[in-house]
Amino acid sequence: MEEFLTVGLWGGEGGDRWSFVVNNGGIIGMEIVHANGIASITFKCGDEYGVLQHSRKFGGTGEGWKTDKISLNWPEEYLTSISGTVADLWQHIIIRSISFKTNKGTEYGPYGVVTGQPFSYSTEGGVIVGFHGRSGTLLDAIGAYVKIPQKKDNTLKMALPVPRGPGPWGGHGGMEWDDGVFPAIRELHLYVGDSVIHAIRVSYQSKDGEPLLSPKHGGEGGEPIDPIKLEVSKEFLIRIAGFYGPVEGSGSFKALRSITFYTNKAKYGPYGDEIGQAFTSSVAPGRVVGFHGRSGAYLDAIGVHMEYF
């Protein structure tokens, strides 16, 4: 089974969950219905034999709204970036605008109205091969699936999405993220300052033994600590623990205030200040094989995927 990164979701919590991913081939077209926001999106894909496949329409009809179509010259041209904005429309948080970019530098959009909270994701050598989201009468939320190239690259990405492990623990702000699961965790990179965890970035190991670096989950603040480096043949994570609570100067906004990592060999941390509500992952025999959580300006929440012995 091919490995790919799950990116997002961005948007509201209305509507029903949906998912569309290309198994063989690539995305060759999209149809977007939009006006004051995004009413719906439809995908078209093709393979090397010219067989075409259309997704269902994700969203409503958008009666009277404008329809735009995107055509890509796959396999020479493929999607590498998605961006947009999220805001309220008719008392519902939805995708208000959306844009796409390809490996050729061509930009499509923005479609809809550029207003509200921005979001964006751009691959570093990967290919967007599908999307997931929420929709009802409008496009409530959207995320993407990114395929990992077959060539070796020490900054590329993730694995197949899986059911959630324990957690996440923390606040409810920011955007949801999920790295998936991996054979091993190689390094942990933390950004800490002002008694709060600003961000985390994880270096995993692929099934081929190659390092795969996750996106940076969190904001640009904080100072980087020395990376936690694990000798994967001998050392593995078994548990995380920490504290979360309101961030000073941010009212009731909650984020991770402290985090500690436990391996079968050692304890790393605590990093940050042990203030607020304590949490810990399972102490049952097993190992951590991935992380998920929420992030924005800070690392709002974190959880783990476990492989139990």
Swiss-Prot record:
This is Agglutinin. Residues 4-148, 163-308 form the Jacalin-type lectin domain. The modification N-acetylmethionine is found at M1. Belongs to the jacalin lectin family. It comes from the Eukaryota. One of its GO terms (biological process) is heterophilic cell-cell adhesion via plasma membrane cell adhesion molecules. Gene3D superfamilies: Jacalin-like lectin domain. One of its GO terms (molecular function) is D-glucose binding. Keywords: Acetylation, Chitin-binding, Hemagglutinin, Lectin, Mannose-binding, Mitogen, Repeat. The lineage of its organism: Eukaryota, Viridiplantae, Streptophyta, Embryophyta, Tracheophyta. The keyword Acetylation applies. CDD domains: Jacalin. D-mannose/D-glucose-binding lectin. Binds N-linked high-mannose-type glycans. Has a preference for smaller (Man(2)-Man(6)) high-mannose-type glycans to larger (Man(7)-Man(9)) ones. Recognizes both alpha1-6 extended and alpha1-3 extended monoantennary glycans. The addition of alpha1-2Man to the Man-alpha1-3Man-beta branch results in a significant loss of affinity, but beta1-2GlcNAc has some affinity. Has less affinity for biantennary glycans, and affinity is very weak for the biantennary complex-type N-glycans with bisecting GlcNAc. No affinity is observed for tri- and tetra-antennary glycans.
